[in-house]
């Protein structure tokens, strides 16, 4: 789930069991192959969608061999290969939270039915297109373990829009088109980037705790387990003990 803490999300994904990790890898492989086909190239230097898909896969520790093989298969795929369409869905969760879902699907009817079923069974409600999308904006996010002033200066000088400091390090936000300029500048200056990818951030957050928080996390988990769902974003501000 994408929401309050990007560091908590990385910790949760790295701690996923084998079954969940395998499903997560499969989603990334699908995204990489779809990016190759839609962008018409297996070279990330000339295909920004592919570059973003690879960055997301690396953040979730997808092995380099898996990524390379996915690109090769997509480049060599013939006309009979499955065509996946990017589709977004919106809804509401416990505590008045907004939920924005990104999918890659070869069957829109199946996908919307699956998502609606999860909302109905897990205490949420599906919304119309545009009902909550306005509460999110696309941003580049870089996580850096080094929280020094020098690192922050490099980020700011190269286009960072906002920097949040925590015990884990820095969470740097950029305009989507500036993500790689900031990331490359940090790497060139000798800073080890934990992750860098395009994501959706809430413009405002809603504090959710207790039973509502637990119900929301369950709803998001079931949405994330759907094969066609790539990312689930919420505007929830969760207590740290609920995020872990």
UniProtKB/Swiss-Prot annotation:
Q: Name one GO cellular component term.
A: cytosol
Where, per UniProt, does this protein localize?
Cytoplasm
On the tree of life, the source organism's domain of life is Bacteria
Q: Which InterPro entries match?
A: Integrase-like_N, TACO1_YebC-like_2nd/3rd_dom, TACO1_YebC_N, Transcrip_reg_TACO1-like, Transcrip_reg_TACO1-like_dom3, YebC-like
Q: Output the PANTHER family linked to this UniProt entry.
A: TRANSCRIPTIONAL REGULATORY PROTEIN YEBC-RELATED, TRANSLATIONAL ACTIVATOR OF CYTOCHROME C OXIDASE 1
> Which NCBIfam families does this one have?
PRK00110.1, PRK12378.1, YebC/PmpR family DNA-binding transcriptional regulator
Q: Which protein are we looking at?
A: Probable transcriptional regulatory protein DR_2548
Query: Which species is this UniProt entry from?
Result: Deinococcus radiodurans (strain ATCC 13939 / DSM 20539 / JCM 16871 / CCUG 27074 / LMG 4051 / NBRC 15346 / NCIMB 9279 / VKM B-1422 / R1)
């Amino acid at each position: 789930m994408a929401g309050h803490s990007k560091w908590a999300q990385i910790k949760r994904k790295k701690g996923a069991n084998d079954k969940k990790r395998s499903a997560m890898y499969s989603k990334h492989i699908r995204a990489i192959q779809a990016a190759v086909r839609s962008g018409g190239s297996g070279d990330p230097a000339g295909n920004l969608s592919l570059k973003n898909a690879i960055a997301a896969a690396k953040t979730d520790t997808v092995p380099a061999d898996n990524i390379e093989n996915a690109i090769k298969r997509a480049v060599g795929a013939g006309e009979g290969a499955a065509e996946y369409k990017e589709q977004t869905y919106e809804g509401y969760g416990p505590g008045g939270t907004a939920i924005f879902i990104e999918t890659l699907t070869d069957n829109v009817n199946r996908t919307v039915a699956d998502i609606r079923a999860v909302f109905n069974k897990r205490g949420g409600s599906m919304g119309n297109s545009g009902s909550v999308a306005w509460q999110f904006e696309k941003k580049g996010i870089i996580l850096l373990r080094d929280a020094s002033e020098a690192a922050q200066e490099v980020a700011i000088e190269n286009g960072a829009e906002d920097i949040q400091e925590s015990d884990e390090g820095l969470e740097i936000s950029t305009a989507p088109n500036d993500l790689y300029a900031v990331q490359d500048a940090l790497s060139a200056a000798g800073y080890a980037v934990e992750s860098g990818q395009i994501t959706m951030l809430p413009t405002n957050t809603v504090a959710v705790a207790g039973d509502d928080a637990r119900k929301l996390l369950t709803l998001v988990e079931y949405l994330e387990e759907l094969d066609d769902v790539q990312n689930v974003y919420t505007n929830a501000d969760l207590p740290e003990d609920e995020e872990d």
